[in-house]
Amino acid sequence: MLFRSLIADIAGLPKANLHYYFPTKEDLYRRVVQTIFEIWLHAAEAMDDAPGPVEGIGRYIDAKMEISRLHPNGSKVWAYEVMHGAPVIQDYLETTLRDWTAGRVHLIQRWIDEGKMSRINPEHLLYMLWATTQHYADFGHQIATLNGGPLSDAEWQAAKTSVKTMILRGIGALT
């Protein structure tokens, strides 16, 4: 019970409230995993009204990398869950994530059909975007070790610019 007591203390809630809203550890864990996914979904809204991939994917990369910077533990929890076969959130992957992904694929395919980017597989672009942006959270310790310390604000900005340039050029959206 130390785990739940610690969470209640960090959240500034009485332990009884935590038990009321999350009767089991699985309920609490599921909510944590869903919350990081909801944060990522919100980040993807940057693509919705974009005229093309430079703006849409560029803003998405900025948002996802900022989330990796500000909420690295959320990404690590998500990665842990998925790497273990998603025992708690498999239904979420099969519904919410699948539907969301289909919508992003449709948008990216539209940009491809409009000649705004190379003919690539939209799903694999999404996988690459997720892997690249979440790497900065999931492997933050490795990056900090190789960098001689955590990335500074300027280094984060440079990383975002580099990632955007490499991906957008790689998909033929930048020349």
Q: Model-found features: residue ranges?
A:
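An amphipathic alpha-helix adjacent to DNA-recognition modules
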Residues: 21-45, 94
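C-terminal peripheral helix-coil segments that are non-catalytic and often amphipathic
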Residues: 66, 70, 98, 102-114, ...
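Helix-turn-helix
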Residues: 3-27, 31
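Hydrophobic alpha-helical connector segments
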Residues: 45-74, 114, 122-129, 157-160
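Anionic, Ser/Thr-rich low-complexity intrinsically disordered regions
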Residues: 15-18, 36-40, 44-52, 73-77, ...
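Short alpha-helical scaffolding segments that buttress acidic/His motifs in well-ordered protein cores
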Residues: 61-64, 78-81, 129, 133, ...
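Amphipathic alpha-helical segments used for helix-helix packing
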Residues: 69-91, 139-146
